[in-house]
Structures are given as C-alpha cells and as structure tokens.
Amino acid sequence: YLWRGFDLGDGDAAVYGDLKVKHGSGAYAGIWGSSGDATLGTEYDLYAGWGGKVGALDVDASLWTYVYPDAGKGNIGAGDLVDAVISVGAGPANVTLYEALEGDDANEYRYVTAKYTKDKYSAMYGQHMYDEGASPGHIQLGYQYNDNLGFAVSQFVVDNDTVDDNPQFLVNYTLPLTK
C-alpha cells in the first residue's frame, strides 16, 4: 500500500477498491477501502466532491475522511482524519493539493503533487509539507500497460534518516465492474 510515497503495507500486497456515484452536474460521492495499512489495519475512506471544466481547466474539489475501524489498532472514526483535495489540470499536466483539516496534523500538513502524463507514461513529483519543517519529497514514474494493468516506481529524494529511501515498486491490476 503506497501512500504519498510511503509504504504503509510494509511490502505486503493490498487489496483495494471503490464504489462511486456520479451526477451529471459533476458532483460525486463514494467509498474507497483497502486491506493494506500494516499499522492501522483495514481502512475505508468516505468522499464527496465536484469535478468538471472551468474554462479550459479540469478542476476537482473534494473532502475525504479516512476511517480505521480496527479498535485494537487505533479505532479512527469518520471525521477524525479529514483532507480537502483540490486538483487543477490542463491537458497532460495536473497539480493537486491535499490539505489536512482534521486530525493530529490539521492545518499543519499539506501534500502537493505535480503530474505530467503522456500516452501511457506518467511522471509525478510529490512534496510533503509540515509547518515545522522536515518535508520529504518523492518522484513516481508510471507506465499504464492497458486499462487494467499499470506499473510504477516511487523514490524519495531526501537525505533523511526518518524515511525509507529505497525505491518502491508498484503493480496495479484493476477489475472494473462497469465500462
């Protein structure tokens, strides 16, 4: 489970999926779940937002709450951890801001990505930003073989003993329920 460059699954594979409902206006809501957080256990996220065109820009704004129901591993409920996510893109380029609104890092942590996609290839830079400093960044390179199978490698670009700076390799296989 690779989250913003960090391996939350301690190298173990994770199963994840989501169910999303969309409206013609661009509004959407959904639930995302994963088996893969080695520290906090099973995770599910509730989200709602809006995505669409604003002039020539692709814009998406959403709120996410992260839930870890395993009582013995933290019992973090809906609303305990909340991020606002704003994404703006034009053509193959996209910038996304994740702002912590609730939780231990509320109003003290943000994460920003800049991504460029060309055909089946992508390059992304992600930067963690903490108010007190110590902000690791990472690069992720991806290749989307087809609609279902993708590969990526992620590498932190920081000389810091607090992050694992070994490259992380990701294989992603998707089984869509609809087309």
Kindly label every feature range from the protein language model.
Residues 1-179:
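Outer-membrane beta-barrel proteins
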